[in-house]
From Swiss-Prot:
Residues 1-30 form the signal peptide. This is Protein 108. Keywords: Disulfide bond, Secreted, Signal. One of its GO terms (cellular component) is extracellular region. Coiled coil: none annotated. The lineage of its organism: Eukaryota, Viridiplantae, Streptophyta, Embryophyta, Tracheophyta. Belongs to the A9/FIL1 family. Disulfide bonds join 41-77, 51-66, 67-92, 79-99. It is found in: Secreted.
């Protein structure tokens, strides 16, 4: 029975990670990002696709390509995108995400 719960918890974590990645892509495509220039911000964030495997619980450490993509993003661009993404649950009439460190 414990293995079923563990599997369910792992599946939930994987689903949440995948959902967050999808939400980030949606934000990139549908929201105006307050970055100058916008095209540069969008292109940089699109480059984060190489980080997708790292978002799944139990995955290995981030690849060199992922780290390089994150390093190349403008600070304001990343912060504005995270701020916009955090608003999505409320805009969809969902409760805010509450994530633990575990």
């Amino acid at each position: 029975m414990a293995s079923v719960k563990s599997s369910s918890s792992s599946s939930s974590s994987s689903f949440i990670s995948l959902l967050l990645l999808i939400l980030l892509v949606i934000v990139l495509q549908s929201q105006v990002i307050e970055c100058q220039p916008q095209q540069s911000c969008t292109a940089s964030l699109t480059g984060l696709n190489v980080c997708a495997p790292f978002l799944v619980p139990g995955s290995p450490t981030a690849s060199t390509e992922c780290c390089n993509a994150v390093q190349s993003i403008n600070h304001d661009c990343m912060c504005n995108t995270m701020r916009i993404a955090a608003q999505i649950p409320a805009q969809c009439n969902l409760p805010p995400l509450s994530c633990s460190a575990n």
